């Protein structure tokens, strides 16, 4: 059990934490001030001040909240919050990109990845660029080459841009996909105002590098900052290659202990074992996983139990009391129990992202860990820990959440979208065709409806969205499949072509109505034809052929409703007076339909030819229009709405609170239907998230997959 000395040290360190927080708020706090005097100033502290619950036996505690890459690069030590000296020495971290604090798309400190022109860029960190001079040349350029298989995406925040543009010092911030051979711009995003910037070159099919270009006339009277937003704020990310942390001081476990760990596991190779943390796995304690299905708690050699992951954030308590062990998922309240062998002495250091036994580095984001020695925690303790994390990271705890990323029209469970939280309230799909404009992705064609030709090269393994071409060519253009159409809308990926082969896509009977392909790649072709044209694919080869042709849909990674009879609905759930909804969805037609995203007695988001009609039951029956937009990033029950650029608009009609207990409907309402694309959604009950937390919630949802 924790000693009196341990408790006194926790009190002393808590006092110092509060003192430092007050100093950061502008107070002059001498070290001699009585502890009780802090109460007069404590209300001015931010609500997320680190006040971890006082649980028996805490000997070491780590929290990544508030850390920065700059701070950790200067002193790579993860301080033990208890003051007991079990500080973690962090080894091999880059302190930028996806190795370090926060998780950023780019590491602007890496000269291998980025060329930063220091003449124009006054200063930069791993995730921030500061400009004091506009230019007619590129200020920052990626050394990495991107393409359709490796798309450049980022979420940024610009400050100082609006002022500089208004006074004529700067024309715009441009972010450009540039051809690496010709140096010509392929696609350009241009921004003239402060705020959140979202970049995705997902429609650029060829190779490109990325330029950041603050365009102006060499003026020096500006101060503009471009900052990447982290994907995992409040976490430290290990890269799964060689990043790890270790104590210098021995942390010796007793035969009774509890370890709380908050983390997000990553995995791209299910055959590879990943050690999340531990001491000597043959003696005392270790956690590991090899897939995103479950985590193993190992309490000595060959004694282990497994617990299921949830999607994204996981919060587990691993407990031992003599020969009894259990692992509890605090998010789902599910407990797995087991037994283990006799206690083995275990003097030695403690590790994160590996253990003392194996150097199998975990690719994981860790928010924090708490180790209680000599204590088997109670359910009440567990609830306190869960509540603490909810207050520290509110955006990570939706009450309802769904994503369709990773689902396909061929999945056995394609008509169900699992709830990310693990609460079982899955979305159920009805009447979907799972082809063309009804299902996962918006496909131009259903290849099963084409006329298939049985020639020397011919189609096989034909699916709705793909087929293979096989055979031995006769050195002429051979029609593989076709349909009669007045238009072509092809975005396809071709793999398996050999040198000397050729593929014609479109209307081969008329010059200019087709494209000719001679190598593997992704190709786009759109053309209007005469009504009787033959739209198809021809293949030319003099050798054996085995080529795969796949359609790439519009709205890839989205569920698309057809606006005819497609329905998506949840089971009934309660939404109280205060709530926040965050998500990625879009109406894809301009029409006036009383359908879209609805939950009776809480909210109704209807499609309109001018934009979106928002009707909240809280507003006593009064709705309002949001023009020139087809999607919203977030909506709050206090009247706040956030547009795609995170501009805030507000409905100031007096609120009349109510509670709803019905289902949520997507793409329809009553007997009205509308076309929309749905990617993800998170619903936070009893929470009015701030704008910053809405942004964090949105960014977090974009990182999740359905499986």
Protein language model features and the residues they cover:
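Solvent-exposed strand-to-loop "edge" motifs in beta-rich extracellular domains
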Residues: 64-65, 166, 252, 261-268, ...
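Extracytoplasmic low-complexity segments
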Residues: 3-9, 13, 43-135, 179-181, ...
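Localized edge beta-strand/strand-to-loop motifs within extracellular or lumenal beta-rich domains
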Residues: 169, 179, 309-326, 627-644
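Glycan-recognition/cleft segments
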Residues: 272-296, 587, 592-618
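Secreted extracellular polysaccharide-interacting domains
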Residues: 139-145, 237-250, 283-285, 300-305, ...
């Amino acid at each position: 059990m924790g000693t009196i000395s341990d408790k006194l040290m926790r009190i002393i360190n808590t006092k110092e934490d509060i003192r430092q927080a007050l100093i950061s708020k502008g107070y002059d706090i001498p070290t001699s001030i009585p502890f009780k005097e802090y109460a007069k100033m404590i209300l001015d502290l931010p609500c997320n001040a680190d006040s971890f619950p006082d649980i028996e036996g805490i000997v070491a505690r780590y929290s990544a909240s508030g850390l920065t890459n700059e701070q950790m690069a200067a002193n790579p030590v993860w301080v033990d919050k208890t003051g007991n000296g079990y500080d973690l020495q962090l080894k091999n971290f880059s302190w930028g990109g996806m190795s370090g604090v926060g998780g950023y798309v780019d590491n602007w400190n890496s000269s291998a990845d980025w060329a930063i022109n220091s003449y124009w860029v006054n200063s930069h960190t791993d995730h921030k660029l500061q400009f004091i001079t506009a230019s007619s040349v590129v200020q920052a350029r990626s050394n990495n080459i991107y393409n359709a298989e490796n798309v450049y995406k980022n979420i940024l925040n610009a400050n100082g841009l609006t002022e500089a543009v208004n006074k004529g010092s700067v024309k715009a911030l441009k972010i450009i996909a540039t051809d690496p051979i010709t140096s010509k711009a392929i696609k350009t995003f241009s921004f003239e105002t402060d705020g959140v910037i979202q970049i995705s070159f997902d429609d650029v099919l060829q190779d490109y590098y990325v330029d950041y270009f603050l365009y102006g006339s060499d003026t020096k009277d500006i101060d503009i900052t471009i900052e990447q937003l982290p994907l995992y704020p409040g976490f430290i990310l290990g890269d799964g290659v060689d990043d790890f942390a270790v104590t210098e001081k021995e942390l010796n476990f007793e035969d009774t202990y509890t370890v709380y760990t908050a983390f997000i596991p990553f995995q791209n190779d299910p055959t590879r074992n990943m050690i999340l943390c531990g001491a000597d796995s043959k003696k005392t304690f270790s956690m590991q996983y090899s897939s995103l299905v479950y985590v193993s708690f190992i309490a000595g050699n060959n004694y282990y139990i497994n617990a299921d992951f949830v999607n994204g954030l996981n919060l587990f308590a691993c407990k031992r009391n003599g020969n009894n062990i259990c692992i509890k998922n605090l998010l789902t309240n599910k407990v797995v129990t087991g037994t283990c062998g006799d206690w083995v002495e275990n003097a030695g250091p403690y590790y994160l992202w590996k253990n003392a036994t194996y150097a199998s580095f975990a690719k994981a984001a860790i928010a924090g860990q708490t180790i209680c020695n000599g204590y088997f925690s109670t359910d009440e303790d567990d609830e306190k820990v869960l509540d603490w994390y909810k207050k520290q990271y509110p955006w990570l705890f939706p009450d309802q959440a769904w994503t369709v990323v990773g689902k396909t029209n061929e999945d056995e469970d394609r008509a169900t979208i699992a709830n990310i939280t693990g609460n079982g309230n899955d979305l159920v799909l009805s009447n979907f065709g799972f082809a063309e404009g009804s299902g996962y992705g918006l496909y131009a064609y259903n290849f099963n409806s084409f006329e298939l030709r049985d020639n020397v090269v011919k189609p096989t393994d034909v699916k709705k969205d793909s087929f293979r071409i096989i055979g031995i060519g006769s050195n002429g253009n051979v029609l593989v499949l076709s349909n009669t159409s007045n238009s072509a809308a092809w975005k396809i990926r071709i793999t398996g072509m050999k040198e000397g082969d050729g593929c014609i896509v479109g209307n081969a009977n008329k010059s200019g109505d087709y494209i000719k392909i001679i190598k593997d790649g992704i190709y786009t072709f759109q053309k209007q034809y005469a009504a009787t044209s033959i739209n198809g694919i021809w293949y030319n080869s003099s050798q054996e052929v085995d080529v795969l042709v796949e359609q790439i849909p519009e709205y890839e990674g989205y569920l698309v409703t057809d606006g005819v009879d497609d329905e998506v609905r949840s089971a009934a759930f309660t939404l109280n007076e205060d709530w926040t909804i965050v998500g990625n969805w879009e109406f894809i037609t301009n029409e006036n339909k009383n359908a879209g995203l609805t939950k009776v007695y809480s909210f109704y988001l209807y499609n309109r030819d001018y934009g979106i009609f928002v009707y909240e039951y809280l507003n006593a029956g009064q709705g309002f229009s949001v023009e020139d937009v087809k999607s919203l990033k977030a909506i709050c029950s206090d009247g706040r709405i956030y547009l795609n650029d995170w501009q805030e608009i507000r409905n100031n009609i007096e609120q009349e609170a109510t509670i709803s207990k019905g289902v949520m409907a997507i793409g329809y309402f009553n007997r009205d239907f509308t076309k929309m694309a749905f990617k993800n959604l998170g619903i936070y009950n009893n929470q009015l998230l701030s704008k910053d937390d809405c942004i964090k919630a949105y960014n977090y949802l974009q990182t999740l997959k359905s499986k």
